[in-house]
Amino acid sequence: MVSVDFDAFTQGLGLTKYPFSVFTAEEEKEFLSDAFVRPLAYSPAVQAATSRKNIFLYGDRGTGKTALLFELVKASGPGSVVAQITDFSAIPITPSQSDIYSLYISTLANALLKRLLPTMAHFRRPYKLTKHDKVLISYLLQHHTSTLSRNALMDDLRSVQHHRMKRWATSTFNFFRSLLNSAAGAAVDMLSETVSKSLGLPQPTLGGAKEYLQAIDLSVDSTLDEARANLVVLQQTVALCKKVGMESLTLVVDRIDEDSRLRNDSELIADFLRPFLTENDIFYQQDLHFIFSIWSVPFQKVKPDFRSNKFCLEQVRWEPDELLNILNKRLELHSDGKIVAYAQVVDDAAIFREKVLPLANANPRDLWQLMNRIIREQYAQDSTSHVIKVAAMESGIRRFVKEFTFFEYYPRKKDARANSLDVYSYIAHLNKLADIRFTTNSLNAAAGTGSSTQNYIVSMESIGLVRRCEEKGPNGSTLYEIRDPKVRFAVENNLEIRRDA
């Protein structure tokens, strides 16, 4: 059989560029606007963004929450100021409201100082700062910034708190101070020597330069009452932002579940997330707008405590037809418009919908990885084909499931021992089931997990691998089912998933 290189093969499919080599919104920001297809959550969320309402997006990993965030930020308007929070290491894993407000203050402080610092030394600023404003800025510089050195910090504080002429006179004096000290020292030494000689006294010891004139130091008022509630400081920071022209403030809170301290444990993530969402008075601050992006598994644990009816709450998920639309759009963009539907590149569209699409787990990221595997299987089987055959789809699915990096969605704990349980250990137990639904007893009978069975189930629930069914099992027992379609496929097709595959 004649073989061609991979580029020639994909061109034979009708593609001008390969569309399945990157899998996250961050990796293709420039292309994202053209490729973006609106999920059901888009319309209500974008309306909320334009009307400055708080938005809370939740969904499974890979569903495109970050891509939707980018679109919502653009919908906030050209004059809006957006600050993103993706690093939570500055606050404890059991944060208080004060910790969270402090995180918000620090984030806004960085945005505020970027606006202020270029004009701090100007004789005429485009805004007038009161004494209270200056003290607040000084407080933010001292307590809510981490990138400025101590010397630069003090320079910035002086720029804010002292008049330009006063700073110039002080720096001029301090510059000539060493010369003045030397001159004064020489005069005093000469006088001392003359007096000593005339009186027949021992000569005085001549030391180094003496500090006859002390340096003038511009004091900094750092006495802002730190006992005041961080909420008040946050409100004052928002007001100051507005005063200097930062009218539309948006805080985007994303990737809470990716904090390594939380070990990908949905219970820990939920405990960390809860104070962000509950009893949070700042959500009612008129001049500050929030957009949250949250993994659905921990969010469902927090949702009963969250007054969601007061805000825009949208689940990001994709129905099969929506996934096909986004696939079609991607193929069209990477074929210069020659491919307008997936059916043009597959041999059997019905098989694709029935067997391939469900494995995508209702999210674009998995679909791109699945398509990548299927196309490569077709290349390996017949690189001269201009369509993807059913055999390539079937073998591509199996390789996709076997070789999928489950740590992407269920990462190994940071401090885990080599022999500790992880997602592959749990899948190995589930692999022994005869059905994707099970009870504690049926899992124990199949996998021999013994007295640890219930602990395993709790752990699998915690990471989102399995879920509890609404209906009951035999004799009223609790019934569970496997959530991940890849693991479901493995159980139904007796396919072993191994860490070293």
Model-derived features with residue positions:
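Short amphipathic alpha-helical interaction segments
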Residues: 447-463, 468-469
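P-loop NTPase nucleotide-binding core
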Residues: 60-246, 465-466, 475
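Short, amphipathic alpha-helical interaction segments positioned at domain boundaries
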Residues: 478-501
